[in-house]
Amino acid sequence: MIEITPIAQAHFKKLLEPQKEGTHIRVFVINPGTAKAECGVSYCPPEAVESSDTRLTFDGFDALIDEVSVPFLEDAFVDLVEEDAGTQLTLKAPNAKMRKVKDDAPLLERVEYVIQVQINPQLASHGGFIKLIEITEDNVAIIEFGGGCNGCSQVDLTLKQGVEKELIDEFSGELNAVRDITEHESGDHSFYK
């Protein structure tokens, strides 16, 4: 469910040493399943443990997860990263904004999941995103660009070499093409004008 690297485990163990006996960590998602989802880690004293919590046991501490956060923390990864400014704890939870879908889910749901979890985070660096409108009977994904992608001079490149390539590779044999229906208008919002 949640992978915590050995270096991050050692970090948590050290942080917990001076705490009240029985204190562990809590990993959680605020606003799970929404675009505003945020993940966090906090101390969890014994009196804050709920009977419905999921408990993961690590070397020297436990990680507790509330029942609402559990499906959104599937495949989460916690690490302690060395940077120029020091060390930083990172928590990556690819399913925080959207619950992971099953392999046998309808194509529309699986494509939407890949867009939200893999593609939109890449486009967000330019203030952009895509929205899946529908999948046609001939298995063409109809999308619409928004934010910094709308009117961007590089949108055709993003569509063909980015979005379409990634979706066709991911859904080989199921998805035939990706078509953009955006009425692009260049403006101050466009990343590349």
Curated annotation (Swiss-Prot):
Q: Name one GO biological process term.
A: protein maturation
At the top level of its lineage, which domain of life is listed?
Answer: Bacteria
Q: Which keywords does this chain's UniProt record carry?
A: 4Fe-4S, Iron, Iron-sulfur, Metal-binding
User: What does the entry list as the binding residues for [4Fe-4S] cluster?
Assistant: C149, C152
* One function term, GO molecular function aspect: 4 iron, 4 sulfur cluster binding
Q: Glycoprotein: is it a keyword of this entry?
A: no
Cofactor(s) the protein requires to work: [4Fe-4S] cluster
Q: Name one Pfam family in it.
A: Fe-S_biosyn
Cofactor annotation remark: Binds 1 [4Fe-4S] cluster per subunit. The cluster is presumably bound at the interface of two monomers.
InterPro entries with a match to the protein in the record? Fe/S_biogenesis_protein_NfuA (IPR017726), FeS_biogenesis (IPR000361), FSCA_dom_sf (IPR034904), HesB-like_dom_sf (IPR035903), NIF_FeS_clus_asmbl_NifU_C (IPR001075)
Q: Which family does it belong to?
A: Belongs to the NfuA family.
Q: How does it assemble?
A: Homodimer.
Describe the task this protein carries out.
Involved in iron-sulfur cluster biogenesis. Binds a 4Fe-4S cluster, can transfer this cluster to apoproteins, and thereby intervenes in the maturation of Fe/S proteins. Could also act as a scaffold/chaperone for damaged Fe/S proteins.
Protein name as it appears in the record: Fe/S biogenesis protein NfuA
The record lists the organism as Psychromonas ingrahamii (strain DSM 17664 / CCUG 51855 / 37)
What lineage is this protein's organism placed in?
Answer: Bacteria, Pseudomonadati, Pseudomonadota, Gammaproteobacteria, Alteromonadales
